[in-house]
């Protein structure tokens, strides 16, 4: 099998290694698509630690079953699957049978990668997004635009989309957002409708208070948290979905005085993520969620570095890259 691994800062190399055999409860999968995730940007940028070996990346996998180990008989050769595991930037990977789900019929593997939408669905499942809710999404990259689609399945009254990139705001409007704001305009939006009452132009649904019942932060950086705070209504909910990997992530104490609930949108529990993946893939099967406008770039196994470079540069037109070995 072939595998792409990071051998130095921003540099990957394709190696040929023996194809592993699945053990008990495992499945050997031929990888057909693997998403490039921002959570792996740091190891790609920094490369291996001194004395460390190559770094194998990729954890957003969809592929075809080619062999099963003992206790994995529910899967058949040739079935298309997605799930949790890695490394994904390779031609093959051994995955745990219990962490796989079937790719919905008629959906190509690159449009059915379960791991990223499962993490989004699980985060939303712990927030009170219901029919008629006002919801704001801060950050309109892959995660934010995915959240937008999943929020729409809950029939919200209003979706407020926030990002400094005008291209991202346009995408959000095309995917069903009602209002698209630059972060610099958030404070005025939050105050104007309240000042003007139910007739205020700022509130897309005519409500006296245009702030959101639920705010979903999907930037992973502290300025995103600062932008989110003014949009949370009193006794509303802020869900931190973005990955804040290191250091401190201070919150606006005004949330405290508003009686807001803060939800950690990260989930380390495999059973919860797999349940969320089941629900998310149902939305994919029902065409209520689609990767089509989100997967903007595709590369072969030799394009891993190019994919990460586009992501790191926030290149125009880029939302999500998929490696197709």
Kindly give the residue locations of the regions a language model identified.
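C-terminal capping/lid region of NAD(P)-dependent oxidoreductase domains
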Residues: 2, 209, 239, 243, ...
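Glycine-rich beta-strand-centered segment in the early N-terminal region that forms part
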Residues: 18-35, 47-87
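Conserved beta-strand positions in the Rossmann-like core of class I SAM-dependent methyltransferases
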Residues: 66, 160, 239
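A structural motif shared across PLP-dependent enzymes of the aminotransferase-like
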Residues: 85-97
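Mid-domain Rossmann-like dinucleotide-binding core that forms the NAD(H)/NADP(H) cofactor-binding site
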Residues: 110-185, 201
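Glycine-rich cofactor phosphate-binding loops and adjacent beta1-alpha1 units
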Residues: 175-261
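C-terminal substrate-binding/catalytic core of Rossmann-like NAD(P)-dependent dehydrogenases/reductases
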Residues: 248-296, 306
